[in-house]
Amino acid sequence: MHSPSVSSASTISAYSDDKQFTMRIKYGLYLSLFLGLSFSASAESKGPIRVACIGNSITYGYGLADREHEAYPVLLQQKLGAKYQVENFGKSGATLLARGHRPYFQQEEYKKALAFRPDIAVIHLGVNDTDPRNWPNYQDEFIPDYHHLIDTLRAVNPQVRILIARTTPIGVEHPRFESGTRDWQLQIQQAIEQVAKSADVELIDFHAPLYPY
């Protein structure tokens, strides 16, 4: 099991476009470096290596002036090159929790991610699970729900390489910062680390490199 560390993007809409763009550049560069070094396309490949970026608004590129060119999956595609096919399956507001206020499992992006049958899946979910509607009520379901997401990806491609991410920081500007979100996010980070071990997937860090930002 590997424990690589890569950089991250921010989810706080209060950030300037320049800062968001800079963070997403870091996000793409570090992630592409990691993937490129440790999972290269072989000469026997029948086609490009399929990379699914699964997540929430951070993956989707919400708040960017031009998400079609600035969202981190786009930057990742640029850095990895033609031997890879990177697709953005981010859904703004999505929760990992199946009983959260906007479950990723119920979104069209989830269905499309499975139909894509990725060779590599990068999952960054958990930020929206800190919502008071979610974590206080369903926190015991977070780890089982994460396992279910991993299992469904493995069902469509048993050889899929899965990387799950510690979540990006939540800034003091966020209206929920003082409502328990800070403590809940720490609990979610710990849960994600447990999932990485129990599901035998790789853990990457989208938090520490941007804290404090």
Question: Where are the predicted features?
Answer:
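A short helix->loop->beta-strand "cap" motif at the edges of active sites that frequently abuts
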Residues: N157-R161
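Alpha/beta-hydrolase-fold catalytic nucleophile elbow
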Residues: H124, A165-R166
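N-terminal hydrophobic signal/anchor transmembrane helix of membrane proteins
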Residues: L76, Q106-P118, I192-Y213
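Alpha-helical scaffolding segments of alpha/beta enzyme cores, especially the outer helices
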Residues: E141-P144, H148-T152, Q187-Q194
